[in-house]
């Protein structure tokens, strides 16, 4: 087939712990990652001439090398030059539903969809692991976005251990339209404030990762104890974001005052989310928080936990 349409789900963090610094300048992390049904749609087709074209229905999405989806196609063309020459160029059309710069891996999931789509279109037959290794060269969230579901992510987040799927959990997401938080700023500020707590030696970092692996959050997921999952939500980056952006703290408090399993900021933000056990509860929470906050700049979405990552659109 010379074209594919793919569904590219967003993701939230259920747990994000910063363990310490890595020799490559990144942070050593332990995270629980979760796919959600809020998803972009990606269409990939061959266009004959050896070039890469990106189109998007959102005016602020770059259509060149600044777009990680473009870089994913470029990486594949360099890794498989003979196949690229045989099949010709690639046109990538992105229909954007995941908000930009929101901490929901919108760019990473687009890149993951391009890797999966080109593997299918070029009939490469790459394994899941091979696709994830390519994804890790593009960004820390890309490997997770390929397979999705529920997973423990360590190192930069690219070393993944699958966890049992969490079905029947709904998520209410809220984001201020004109607020974005730079991921490098969040990690840099965290380092400045809490760097003294960092673990640097390899063995201690390893035992910290293992502590999370065998810790209460992973146990709650394995046991499908949704109440406990909600209570154990944890994100170290809230320590810098909520003090810098008081409106996020106010939003978090508004969610926490409702009938929710738990509430937290996703990734480096600024999206705040709350978990509920039903769609009707999610709708009630959205309505109540929307009324309480009364801010036209605040956007809301309702999604469900997704048990997979990139899939072919039917």
Swiss-Prot record:
Pathway: Isoprenoid biosynthesis; isopentenyl diphosphate biosynthesis via DXP pathway; isopentenyl diphosphate from 1-deoxy-D-xylulose 5-phosphate: step 3/6. It comes from the Bacteria. GO terms for molecular function: 4-(cytidine 5'-diphospho)-2-C-methyl-D-erythritol kinase activity; ATP binding. Its EC number is 2.7.1.148. Pfam families: GHMP_kinases_C, GHMP_kinases_N. The active site is at residues 11, 141. ATP binds at residues 99-109. One of its GO terms (biological process) is isopentenyl diphosphate biosynthetic process, methylerythritol 4-phosphate pathway. It is an enzyme of class 2 (transferase). HAMAP family: IspE. Belongs to the GHMP kinase family. IspE subfamily. This is 4-diphosphocytidyl-2-C-methyl-D-erythritol kinase.
């Amino acid at each position: 087939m010379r074209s594919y349409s793919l569904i590219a789900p967003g993701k939230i963090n259920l747990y994000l712990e910063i363990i310490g610094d890595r020799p490559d300048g990144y942070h050593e992390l332990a995270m629980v990652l979760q796919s959600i049904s809020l998803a972009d749609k990606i269409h990939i087709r061959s266009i004959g001439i050896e070039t890469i074209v990106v189109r998007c229905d959102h005016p602020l999405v770059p259509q060149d090398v600044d777009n990680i989806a473009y870089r994913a196609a470029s990486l594949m063309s360099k890794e498989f030059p003979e196949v690229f020459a045989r099949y010709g160029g690639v046109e990538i059309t992105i229909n954007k539903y995941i908000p930009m710069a929101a901490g929901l891996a919108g760019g990473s999931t687009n890149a993951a969809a391009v890797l999966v789509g080109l593997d299918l279109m070029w009939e490469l037959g790459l394994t899941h692991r091979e696709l994830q290794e390519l994804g890790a060269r593009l960004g820390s969230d890309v490997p997770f976005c390929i397979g999705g579901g529920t997973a423990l992510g360590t190192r930069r987040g690219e070393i993944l251990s699958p966890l049992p799927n969490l079905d029947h959990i709904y998520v209410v997401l809220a984001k201020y339209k004109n607020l974005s938080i730079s991921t490098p700023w969040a990690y840099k500020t965290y380092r400045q404030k809490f760097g003294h707590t960092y673990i640097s030696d390899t063995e201690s970092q390893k035992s910290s990762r293992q502590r999370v692996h065998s810790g209460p959050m992973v146990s709650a997921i394995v046991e499908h104890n949704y109440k406990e999952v909600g209570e154990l939500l944890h994100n170290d980056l809230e320590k810098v974001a909520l003090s810098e952006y008081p409106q996020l703290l106010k939003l978090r408090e508004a969610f926490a005052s409702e009938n929710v399993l738990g509430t937290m900021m996703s990734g480096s933000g600024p999206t705040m989310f709350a978990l509920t056990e039903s769609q009707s509860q999610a709708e009630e929470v959205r309505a109540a928080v929307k009324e309480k906050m009364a801010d036209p700049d605040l956007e809301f979405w309702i999604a469900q936990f997704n048990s997979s990552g990139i899939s072919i659109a039917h």
